[in-house]
């Protein structure tokens, strides 16, 4: 992790600190969970260690690393001598319950109670109304968190994904916390040239001892706002001047309301099934609404699919898993027929998206990026000592902007159907399952890694069924004898080698999801510097 300087005697060029770990050890530079937040706080979550396949659900491990999704946590401290900290709304919000407070972007609030974590009790200084507001929809007045261009704890790859979204012109930019240097920031800009086409350049913003900021020591600023203003007026050595802040999507809420945060068994009557999205072996998936005003996805399970008691126990754990690459569980109806209420993903399953949707036209960079997103979500599950057990494209959901999220984690363990529990029955996903799991029931995070390798083949073949021409029995026999799928057509050899690593016979020889995330995120950029030098900066 050294400072690399371009030595150009003609024109003084400075480079930002480059993260050499890109070329040293792909995947191992990822530390704490990169879920975007404004003000992170760590919690200690008790989740059973499912990677010990002998353990029961009741055996718990205390796992450090679960990141609370709340933007601002704890009791607010006052500012100056006023005794009041004012917050400003960054987005519009429509109240979902009688306890909520509707508001418009730009409204200012006095916070009355911040003890509920993700939901704060507030008074609007615009309307005088009082009620609960989602804490990640507001920021302190005059803070950088309130700026359109500030994206907080956004990872480098997610920054590129957002900046390269359709419709953003050259010069679209954002500022985020640096992943590699504490207290520093990164400026990410959408650029274009004849060689690369549309791409993103990243510049390190350093902090002075006296509190100022700079990209180059020859241009120092008291505030980030002044730095942005300066480079908005002139490129001054950057790839181009800053033109427009990147559009921020609406923040996701991890609960339906403040009331369902802790009491999330809800009445069936509060749900309306509107449009059936899919039909599976064990139930249906619907687009619906909660309370008539909040769009959700509702999975309805056929009676007898699983024990309501076991489901409720597992749901308690699933509700604690909060990550931007996992489909968020909102609420449940635990009496049969069981309803599982989650966030709604507009493009449906990855399998359908690849076979029949917009995914048919995707090129390799998009497909690798989607794989990286899944690996990132699974790396979180890995850190939390949890297991998916049924990882495949049918259980990955797609949203706008090619956002991918993992669904149905943990549910496979609860299914009581004989055609499934036999593990070699007609309903069991043999072609995605590691041999030690299919033959002996040894499900661990390493059997999930095997399944991820199969999912990679689904991506590059646009949803083709694995092991074409072979039935389940033949697959199990051939895999046990050492057979592995050959490299799919038009798939790079390096990607097939990654699949083969996922399919190692010895589970312990398979890579971690942390490694898979790093490898895939840097797949097309491993030979480029992480941070760009500027021209005459």
UniProtKB/Swiss-Prot annotation:
Activity regulation, free text: Inhibited by phosphorylation of Tyr-531 by leukocyte common antigen and activated by dephosphorylation of this site.
InterPro entries linked to this entry: Fyn/Yrk_SH2, Fyn/Yrk_SH3, Kinase-like_dom_sf, Non-receptor_tyrosine_kinases, Prot_kinase_dom, Protein_kinase_ATP_BS, Ser-Thr/Tyr_kinase_cat_dom, SH2
Lineage: Eukaryota, Metazoa, Chordata, Craniata, Vertebrata
Similarity-based family: Belongs to the protein kinase superfamily. Tyr protein kinase family. SRC subfamily.
Modified residues (Phosphothreonine): 12
Quaternary structure and partners: Associates through its SH3 domain, to the p85 subunit of phosphatidylinositol 3-kinase.
Catalytic reactions of this protein: L-tyrosyl-[protein] + ATP = O-phospho-L-tyrosyl-[protein] + ADP + H(+)
Official protein name in the record: Tyrosine-protein kinase Fyn
